[in-house]
């Protein structure tokens, strides 16, 4: 089984698309335990989601992700890169663009009551957080449209 956590409108074929709002395959609040047995999931995909959780909520979610992921299971995460946002904010000469980017990166799109950032990550912070949950083999992914974002691919220890 493959999970797309916090899918929003970005549904992935071959994945169970989970979100707090419909349309999705499974409506579920990720602030609560995942409705799957231990070590039952082959892959977890999460794009633009983890920064929407408070520090306390993130600690619970990362624990749940590790709990349901099979040993050797893949995890792929995209999130805002706070370090990149700060550097760009300080170096950008276009005041409008500077604030538009900063507000979106730090506070998210604010399209609905769930679309607000409550957390921030750097690559090293995200890796450290996931190591606490028995995750290893970290690799940086790359997608051109996500320059300045963290794209992390890793797996749960076997």
What are the language-model segments listed below?
Residues 2-85, 152-156:
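Conserved SAM-binding loop
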Residues 57-60, 64, 70, 74-157:
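S-adenosyl-L-methionine-dependent methyltransferase catalytic module, highlighting the catalytic core
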